[in-house]
Design a protein with these regions (language model features):
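Serine-dependent carboxylesterase/thioesterase catalytic core
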Residues: 72-151, 155, 164
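N-terminal charge/polar-biased segments
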Residues: 5-8, 188, 192-194
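Hydrophobic alpha-helical membrane segments, chiefly transmembrane helices and signal peptide h-regions
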Residues: 2-3, 101, 183-187
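C-terminal region of N-terminal signal peptides and the immediate post-cleavage residues
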Residues: 2-17
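A broad, low-specificity signal marking well-ordered, structured residues that form hydrophobic/aromatic
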Residues: 9, 54, 155
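Active-site catalytic motif of lipid deacylating hydrolases and related acyltransferases
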Residues: 13-89, 160-183, 187-192
Length: 194
């Protein structure tokens, strides 16, 4: 294979829609339960369009500064897609700590420690939507929906009582209950934008 062919995608390799999903703390590598439910729901709402899914590669441990590693990985994949699949509509998504990863790459509130791969200025035109679940920034009054760049195309879902995103939350089970209703709600929102 010629060296120039490495890392490039052909049109048939490019999905119509690509979900970049960052899983939550202690979820097994991959999309996790919430990411899988969201991607499945979205596939059922976009007709015959193809939906790819990229699982952000990062530790997702209780060392929350590792969210920067996830942000660097997500940003790298997003930039790859923009450069190699310019017609693919991107959807950025995450759950819990993974929502924090999406916060970091979208600069809400500011890039985190160790994040050194910011998105170039042309990326927002390729991002159709952002959907996050149990976002820690929401607890601080900084949901993605207030972003001047991303707000109109963002849905930042917090179950009532979720202690990670609800300032009055005290129900850990609420934090685990995003598959189903909330993932379907987010898929409806995103399907209207892609």
């Amino acid at each position: 294979m010629p060296i120039g062919a490495l890392g490039t995608a052909s049109a048939q390799d490019c999905p119509d829609i690509e979900v970049v999903f960052a899983r939550g703390t202690n979820d097994a590598p991959g999309l996790g339960n919430i990411g899988g439910a969201f991607v499945d729901a979205l596939r059922g709402k976009v007709g015959g369009r193809s939906v790819g899914a990229y699982a952000v590669n990062y530790p997702a441990t209780f060392d929350f500064l590792q969210a920067a590693a996830g942000a660097n990985d997500a940003s790298g994949h997003i930039q790859y897609m923009v450069n190699n699949c310019p017609n693919t509509r991107l959807v950025l998504s995450g759950y819990s700590q993974g929502a924090g990863v999406i916060d970091v790459i979208s600069a809400v509130p500011v890039p985190g420690i160790g994040f050194d791969n910011p998105l170039p200025p042309n990326v927002p035109e390729h991002v159709a939507a952002i959907a996050v679940f149990g976002n820690p920034s929401a607890k601080l009054g900084l949901p993605l929906t207030v972003s001047p760049v991303w707000g109109g195309r963002s849905i930042d879902l917090c179950n009532p009582g979720d202690p990670i995103c609800d300032s009055a939350g005290d129900n850990v089970e609420a934090h685990r209950a995003y598959a189903g209703g909330p993932t379907n709600q987010a898929a409806d929102f995103v399907a209207g934008l892609v």
